[in-house]
Amino acid sequence: MAGKRRVELGRRRFIRVAGGTVAGAAVVGGGTFTALATGELDGSSPDLLDGIPRSLVLSLPEAGGSDPVPPLPDQLGEGVMSAPSPGTRIPFTGGTVDPQTVEDSIPTTLPFEFKTSGYRIDTELPEYMRPWRDRPTTWSNVSPNTENVYLDAEGVIQYRPDWDTPGYDQPVTQIQFALGCITSYRNTTDPERKTLFLKRARSQAKRLIDKRVEARGAWYFPYPFDWYHPEHSGVSYKAPWYSGMAQGEAISLFIQLSQLDGITEEERTLYKAAADGTFASLLRGDNAKPWVVNKDKNGYLWIQEYPGATAGTGDYTFNGMIFATFGLWDYYVATGNELALKLYDGAVTTMRDHFLRLRQAKWLSYYCHTHRVPTKGYHQHHINLFRQLHWQTGSPVFAHQQDTLINDYPNALPLPKGSVAAFAAGTHTLYKLKTAGAPLYGWSPSMHDAQLGTKKVTFSRATQAPVDVRRRIEGRGIYYRISAGAYAGWWVGEYYPKVFLRGVHLPTTYRPQRTATFPPNVSITCIKFGSDGTTGTTKTVKFAKSSNAPFDRRAIVNGRPMVHITAGGLTGYWAPAGPVLTDGH
């Protein structure tokens, strides 16, 4: 790092705001945004620089980081799949669908009473915030052929455990592939690509409809193979079996297909009927088979990704339930059905109240309520899913829960190319850790981020180093991996302002905006960052009583969680989360 170009001290003065009042300040008293508050500004700002030039602390690189969506989880990836026993018959109804008969069969009452909270659904969400819009199928994956998935002669995805084994219909895989194709159909303007994306989505929907099982006045989609999970006791199935995740996601598929402009009116009617029939399955409890919905002993509603062999049992899987709940969102927005809203209310109430069962403080969250196995592969999905629950309900509680998961174990995917960490002048400790290999250098259950060595390095002036990973180290804080130079492969702890990742990373947009509270008699320095090469400005505020401000975003900005203020004298400033309290607790 010592050989890197010299970091020039920003020539603009570090702006110190004189004491006094803030006219039109962003912060207000009394928990509303309708009145102005008087904030005492410190006569001199605390020294935030602490060995680092102001031009680094108060500016951002031109391009910030992002929070990429990880690949969808493989529902069967950690289990063992096998052919059904000889002579096993996989039922299916088949035949022509009579939409009126399906509509008439929809239950008009809930399967049982369960806990709710009065959550409503935001039916006016921007397009990009709606379910599955963040997961387009790429053009390179429109005709997949991998070890686990391939297309059959009808263009339908088949799932196989390896190259040498015949494939099977796997409802969740087919549904998620189709939903991705629908999103890509919406996004692309290329006629050839639109045609193929729509063809793929239609093919998956047709297979589901053809293979449906009509039972208890509802549609179910069978899994035609045996499967068990070696770590989750009780998750063991003989064909045919059913999944609440597939049932809920199928509702999203049929509703979203019915809304496309490229289908015929006959198809539109069919897809709406398919959505009705599938929705009915979420109104059938566990008092008969098949079932995917039950109430636990505390009165909470569950949509079981993996229903148990007996009533009231199951894996109580968190991600599968939320993905299924998105189907209720789609169904209510399309139909206004009040039972769908009631089920949605119950499902999100369950997720809110079981958050502490999902969370593992300062580490990976748990996969399910029953076994509480931490899972690296699903933690980021939990973050994304709680973010969408916040958007759909408008509740700050889900936003706060998402923020908590980010703090516990932030997205550990590779940082954007060109990411750098700033180092203050002085002595720093570097660590050699035992991790998985490139490109993630992630946590491994056999390695546990074991410390292999340490090194003290001293810099006479502030410097920067390229980094490629930012993640939590087991039993420690957040660390960066240095990716080039004399210290390539060594890790250093995030410690603002001594060591921090430059730029905006892991951004989250809130809808509606949230409320930040400035506690009384606490000096808090807010920053309006300059672009690269331009030093930003600061305002240090202190209020005699608790004062509130609206914010629309949260991100890791130059190495610490911050919220973006949107009104009054602090408009455009970032305030540090922590000293500034956020709603939703």
Specify the residue positions occupied by each region the protein language model found.
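N-terminal secretory signal peptides
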Residues: 1-13, 22-28, 36, 46, ...
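Terminal, non-catalytic domain-edge segments
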Residues: 5, 51, 56-161, 165-167, ...
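Long, well-ordered core segments of solenoidal/helical folds
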Residues: 103-118, 124-164, 198-220, 272-295, ...
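Carbohydrate-binding/catalytic loop surfaces
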Residues: 128-166, 217-241, 292-317, 360-381, ...
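Well-ordered alpha-helical scaffold segments within catalytic/enzyme domains
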Residues: 175-192, 248-266, 323-338, 381-395
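SH3-family beta-barrel domains
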Residues: 415-443, 501-531, 585
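SH3/SH3-like (including bacterial SH3b) beta-barrel domains
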Residues: 445-460, 531-544
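SH3/SH3-like beta-barrel superfamily modules
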Residues: 457-494, 541-578
